[in-house]
Amino acid sequence: MRIGIIFPVVIFITAVVFLAWFFIGGYAAPGA
């Protein structure tokens, strides 16, 4: 029942974290 609400939230948080990690990793260590 609550899966319908929790699942999209988990997907959204995962996407935000991944984008943040990609952005920080790409700009914090441009040579890496």
From Swiss-Prot:
A single cellular component GO annotation: plasma membrane
Cell membrane as UniProt keyword: yes
Localization terms from the record: Cell inner membrane
Membrane topology: Single-pass membrane protein
Coarse class of the protein's main subcellular location: membrane
InterPro entries for the chain: YoaK-like (IPR047839)
Swiss-Prot/TrEMBL induction comment: Constitutively expressed, may be induced at pH 5.5, repressed by thiol oxidant diamide (at protein level).
Keywords annotated in UniProt: Cell inner membrane, Cell membrane, Membrane, Stress response, Transmembrane, Transmembrane helix
TM spans (from-to): 3-23
Protein name: Uncharacterized membrane protein YoaK
Organism lineage: Bacteria, Pseudomonadati, Pseudomonadota, Gammaproteobacteria, Enterobacterales
Name of encoding gene: yoaK
